[in-house]
């Protein structure tokens, strides 16, 4: 089987959003730009694969350093035995980063190896993962951090011009009127709205009852229905997610 002959870290930066947007002010102190980090794996058959790790958006040089640390662990080994390669990387990183930074990088290696293997075999990646369950996955526009109506209208204009019919906004449990207004404005354009409640960043996260109350309040003020709810409660609350599933149709 093809061996891993080369591993490269790729960092790409570019303009992102507007300097006055709330997301930039809150999350990007270096200004309106954003970096993505990728692992490029080259097999000895000449095929390359790419995988992205989200860590690089906020800490690109940390991402690069962990790639450098991981590189010797998999060089020269079978690039098709992806499960074993991930295990090699975990044996190096789990002691000090069972979750968090190293997991982002290991994920990038995992994706890159799947990409390279699929290209080598001449099949789409989903065939390596058991085949497709649906013929396609609709895309959505991720935004909704706006603090003005004009900001929302601008994002909706962009989505409409691209033919994108799904829109994700950020909102918290007190944003009932704001959420209903956005859903009505989007609905005029045939666009459905999903809501990211950002509870992965909350300590402590909100309760299930808060989420249900918010959904019911929003739905009482619009004829449209939320497409989905994301990060509704904290990531370490599996029982809460089960309860939420039982209490809402969203």
What are these regions (language model features)?
Residues 1-45, 49, 54-55:
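Structured beta-strand/loop patches that form or line metal/cofactor-binding pockets in enzymes
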Residues 136-151, 170-172, 201-208:
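Active-site mouth loops of central-metabolism enzymes
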